[in-house]
Structure formats: C-alpha cells, structure tokens
C-alpha cells in the first residue's frame, strides 16, 4: 500500500501523500472511486478492503443503516484537447480526467484547460467529493437503503412503492417528487441524487473506456469500441442488450432486476463488474438500465398557447394572437391538426408580428394544410445555484426551498439555456447522444456551456436520431415541460437507448411510474 502519511487540521485532512485519496488514472485499477480524505463523518464506517485498491470494496463505505456508498473524489476534466493522449482516436470527444493531486486548485486546472466538474460544488463551496449510493434504493425497514440484491423502490404503488417508507419521520408519496423525502428517511443530510452527480459518473465511465486497453480493470471493455460502456439490464429479459452474457436476478415485477444483481447464476462473461461505472467490483452499479432514476438540479417553467393558423409557405408562419415570443426563442409544437408534419418537434422562431412568427428553416409548402389547433410551448429552464445545498431542496412547488414552482426557482436556481436540436429535418424529440464525430460535450471551464456539461446535456450538433457508440447510443429526449423532473439511466426494457448518459426531459414532478426509482447521495 502507498505511503499514507496525513496532516489534519481538526478533523479535516489538509495534506496527504496517498494517491488513493484521488480519483485515480483512467483505465487503471481503482479509477473512479477513492478513499475518503479525513476522519469519517458520523454513521460511516470502512468496509473490509476500503483502503485497498485491489479490493472489491475499495472506496466503498457503509452507513449505519447498512447502505453501501462509494466515495467519488473531486476531479477535473478536459474535453477535445489536441494535447490529449486520446485525441488521435476520439478527436473532439477525447476526455481527460485529473485529480487534485495534479491540480491543487480550480484556477490551476482552468489555466491548463481543465474544468472542475459542477458535481463538486454544493452549498456555495467546492467539495472534496461526495458519497453516492452503490446500488439503487430498496426498502430497508422503512429506510431507502443502498443494498445489494434488494428490490428496487419505485414511484408507483404496484412496484415496491416509496410511499411505504417511514424512516426519520418522513411522509413519502408515490410521485417523482416523493424521492426527496424518500432520501431523507436515511437522514436529514442525504438527498436524492443530482443530475450533476450522475453526469460526473457518466463522464468517468466514458473516460475509463477511452483509456482502457483490456478488460483487466474495465470488465465491460470492448476493443472494437462498439459496446465500450457499462452494461445494464435493458433487453426486457433480465440481460444486457450490449452483452447478453450478463444476467440479473428478477425482483418479481416484470423484468426488473434486483439491485446490483448482475452476474446472477454465474457462467462465462456473467460478472458483476460489467454493470459498474468503472468496470470493477468497487464501482457504482446499474447506472445503465434496470430503473430510471430521479435526478435533481434542473427544472423548467413552461406555458402553452393554441395555434390559430399555420401557412403552407417557406418559411412556415404560425398565427397565435399575442404570442409574446422573441427572435431566437425555442418552442415545441404538438397536436396540430392537418399539418401534422409540425408535431413533436422543437423550433427556433423569428417574430414577424405581434400575432405571427415563422419557424426558422421550415418549408411547409408541401405539408398538408393546417385545419385546427395545436399547442406551442415555450419554457424557461433553470439549474441549481452553486450556493444551493442539494439537501435543502423540498418536494413542493410553492415554498422558497421547493425544487419546483416560481418561488423555489427564484430562491434556489439560476437561468439555464440548454442546447436543442432545432434544424428542420433533425429536430424531433427523440434524440441520442452523438452525431458522427461532432463534439458532444462543451469544453468550457465556466458559464452556461460549463453547466451543460455538468448536467451531461449535449451540444445541439452533438445529438442525432442515430447517436454514436462512444456514448452508448444513449437516449436524449428533448422536451419543454412545466415542472420538469429529470430522470436518468433508462429502464429494463429500453434496449440500447438506456445507458449511463440516458436522459429524459419529458417527465414532471407528479408522475408515478413503476420503472422510476431513486438512489441517494451526501456531501459532507
């Protein structure tokens, strides 16, 4: 084991010379998790092998309820740098990861072209890392716990409902927003995971796959780079679409698997490590498929207006009395009668009058004539402020701490401008990550573009209907939805669209779905 000399200031580790406290080197043993750099917070304890990079429990800790959580150390990333060792193969999508052993401060990292991942800012402070559930949550005597071979909780009464949780005095209901109090059943400082944290693990997984040269420290590695990503329960038969050798144990509901049960039954190639973000037993399981998971930190306030007319012209002009839209606004059209070619797409608009606007690049001359109605929806998107602590979010839509609604958004969030595919012919709602060799993630170290990468949102030119193998052909469902609640990862029947990057912007806080659950995280 490496030299473990440490210097503490009170309970805070201020100096160490042990590389195991860092994120590690992509493609090698132990990458993607690490050792907590200080005295463990109350309730946490080491497991057998926590300090040993060769152990299946490396970087894994147990909370007092029995939950197994992985420590994810702070890291910096660089996208598409010509100086990258991976640039020759991956070009604008080459990913480099560096820890605080390489750059002691964010300023030093930024100067070298590396960005601090947004997941490591919470409550107005940069964090040394975060604890993240190794497994999807299951019901552990009324507590949402991260346990191997549990029956994953869902937001619906028919399938291990979160409403059955009672721990820590919480009242939990079977809606997506119920995942916020569900996480609190483990303790007040826990939170339903954020999309920032999820995207950080997705980025680590992709970087690990790019750097790996064999399956030795990356069990899901594919030298052909076609299925070079974590495997998941996705083929609607308790197996992985990308590798049918990997099998999950049924939890008794449809084809949902028990938490962390990849490798069930044994056999050649059927190993748990193929289901983790780092391809090792110490990694986080089931980010690809099995259950969609609620991921906090982003929402939308949207309103719809009814179409009064649409022209067969180039460009197509829409009539809505007093529409209030401005040049460059992005809108979604659904349910138009007659001119159905407009439906289920996003558009950039140009204002032509108080009651009219055109759809940029849309020639509707050959479309069927508009007959009646249709909705145009415009939304304002928001992201958690750096000053906001994830544990502070509440589940309503009217209070100052609520994740949804104008009051909570004003207090807890900042404006965000997502990139959407609005080019005519490529502007459908169903998108996937990747578009030929185009850059998918922004490389900026600050600003709106940096936030998009922190959330794992693709560039407009970085998505397409077909996607790319580098990003697992993962699903990106672009949508404009009031009270948006993000869900990530996909479900047991989503096949290739499920994956570590998979994200849907379709869902709202009051949905209740048997294939949507949660896991927890905590900043300390």
Report the location of each language-model feature.
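Short, low-complexity N-terminal tether/leader segments at secretion or assembly junctions of large
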Residues: 1-17, 369
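Short aromatic-cysteine micro-motif
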Residues: 65-66, 92, 97-287, 392, ...
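Short, solvent-exposed loop/turn elements at domain surfaces
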Residues: 78-84, 139-144, 496
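Short solvent-exposed strand/turn elements
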Residues: 85-103, 358-374
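Small/polar beta-strand repeat architecture
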Residues: 303-380
């Amino acid at each position: 084991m490496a030299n473990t000399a440490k210097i503490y200031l009170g309970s805070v580790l201020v100096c160490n010379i042990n590389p195991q406290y860092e994120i590690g080197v992509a493609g090698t043993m132990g990458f993607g998790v690490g050792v907590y750099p200080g005295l463990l917070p109350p309730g946490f304890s080491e497991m057998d092998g926590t300090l040993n990079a060769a152990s299946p429990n490396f970087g894994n800790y147990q909370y007092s309820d029995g939950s197994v959580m992985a420590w994810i150390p702070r890291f910096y990333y660089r996208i598409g740098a010509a100086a990258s060792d991976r640039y020759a193969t991956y070009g604008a999508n080459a990913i480099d990861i560096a820890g605080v052993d390489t750059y002691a401060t964010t300023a030093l990292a930024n100067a070298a072209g590396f960005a601090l991942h947004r997941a490591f800012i919470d409550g107005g402070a940069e964090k040394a890392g975060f604890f993240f559930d190794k497994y999807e949550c299951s019901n552990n005597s009324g507590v949402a716990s991260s346990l191997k071979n549990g029956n994953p909780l869902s937001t619906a009464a028919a399938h291990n409902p979160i409403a059955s949780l009672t721990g820590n005095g919480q009242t939990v209901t079977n809606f997506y927003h119920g995942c916020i109090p569900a996480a609190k059943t483990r303790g007040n400082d826990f939170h339903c995971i954020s999309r920032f944290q999820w995207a950080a693990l997705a980025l680590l997984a992709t970087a690990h796959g790019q750097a790996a040269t064999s399956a030795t420290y990356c069990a899901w590695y594919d030298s052909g780079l076609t299925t070079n990503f974590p495997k998941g329960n996705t083929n609607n038969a308790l197996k992985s679409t990308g590798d049918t050798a990997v099998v999950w144990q049924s939890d008794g509901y449809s084809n949902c698997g028990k938490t962390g049960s990849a490798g069930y039954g044994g056999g050649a190639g059927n190993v748990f490590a193929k289901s983790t973000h780092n391809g090792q037993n110490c990694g986080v399981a089931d980010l690809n498929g099995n259950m969609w998971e609620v991921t906090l930190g982003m929402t939308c306030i949207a309103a719809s207006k009814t179409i009064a007319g649409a022209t067969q012209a180039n460009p197509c002009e829409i009539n809505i009395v007093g529409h209030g839209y401005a040049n460059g606004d992005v809108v979604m059209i659904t349910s138009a009668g007659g001119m159905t070619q407009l439906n289920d797409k996003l558009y950039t608009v140009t204002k032509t009058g108080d009651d009219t606007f055109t759809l940029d690049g849309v020639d509707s001359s050959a479309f069927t004539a508009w007959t009646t109605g249709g909705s145009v929806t415009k939304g304002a998107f928001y992201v958690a402020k750096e000053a906001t602590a994830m544990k502070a979010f509440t589940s309503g839509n009217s209070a100052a701490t609520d994740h949804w609604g104008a009051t909570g958004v004003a207090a807890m969030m900042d404006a965000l401008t997502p990139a959407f595919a609005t080019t005519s012919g490529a502007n459908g709602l169903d998108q996937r990550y990747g578009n030929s060799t185009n850059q998918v993630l922004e490389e900026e170290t600050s600003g709106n573009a940096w936030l998009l990468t922190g959330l794992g949102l693709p560039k407009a030119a970085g998505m397409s209907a077909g996607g790319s193998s580098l990003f697992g052909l993962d699903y990106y469902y672009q949508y404009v939805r009031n009270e948006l609640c993000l869900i990530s990862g996909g479900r047991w029947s989503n096949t290739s669209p499920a994956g570590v990057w998979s994200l849907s912007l379709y869902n709202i806080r009051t949905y209740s779905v048997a294939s949507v659950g949660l896991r927890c995280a905590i900043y300390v």
